[in-house]
Amino acid sequence: MATPHINAEMGDFADVVLMPGDPLRAKHIAETFLEDVREVNNVRGMLGFTGTYKGRKISVMGHGMGIPSCSIYTKELITDFGVKKIIRVGSCGAVRMDVKLRDVVIGMGACTDSKVNRIRFKDHDFAAIADFDMVRNAVDAAKALGVDARVGNLFSADLFYSPDGDMFDVMEKYGILGVEMEAAGIYGVAAEFGAKALTICTVSDHIRTHEQTTAAERQTTFNDMIKIALESVLLGDKE
């Protein structure tokens, strides 16, 4: 049944949901990659759709910006609508010089300056990691598509406009591939409620060099990321 944030019924969502931050990007994914699409959510403008990809039922819905927003939607999808796997598809900023614009990053883990996982884990550190099989399937899908994806840790920041520039030096030292705002929260929700999750990001800007992708470049590389996510779902069905 409907929740305060999702006006759908059980069965409206597939067991796998792709989640970009922007609800309009969710609409674009549904219209571009899925067939037999129908809208299943529009509360607060957070659009959600269900359709099929190569005959496989898949849903796509926005999750908004930041851990609090994405945590609400992922929790409700898992506990109220039977969703088993969530794949965040978004953008990130690079801090390492060997990570380039338009690189696709598969987030096997996510550090964070948020306390959300400490709250749920009795004030202890929680290793916020993606599901191994989902990571492996994404890597295999990327190889099959000819995309040289990077695999490693992300950093989920609470502040988009951070006043602590020195923190980027620490991230680089520890090998962080990209900075975004949601992965650690999504991995924590999945762990708490018995689901599986993965984050795949496209590098849209470089924090060190101040380079940014153009709208056309973002669209092309974004499509590569979505194809990886969708094909990884099909690979997961073969397990």
From Swiss-Prot:
Documented EC number(s): 2.4.2.1
Catalytic residues as annotated in Swiss-Prot or TrEMBL: D205
Presence of the UniProt keyword Transferase in the record: yes
Site label Important for catalytic activity, positions: R218
Keywords in alphabetical order: Glycosyltransferase, Transferase
Coiled coil: none
Positions bound to phosphate: G21, R25, R44, R88, V89, G90, S91
InterPro entries: DeoD-type, Nucleoside_phosphorylase_CS, Nucleoside_phosphorylase_d, Nucleoside_phosphorylase_sf
A Pfam short name: PNP_UDP_1
Subunit structure: Homohexamer; trimer of homodimers.
Name of the protein in question: Purine nucleoside phosphorylase DeoD-type
Organism (species): Salmonella arizonae (strain ATCC BAA-731 / CDC346-86 / RSK2980)
Phylogenetic classification of the source organism: Bacteria, Pseudomonadati, Pseudomonadota, Gammaproteobacteria, Enterobacterales
Gene expressing this chain: deoD
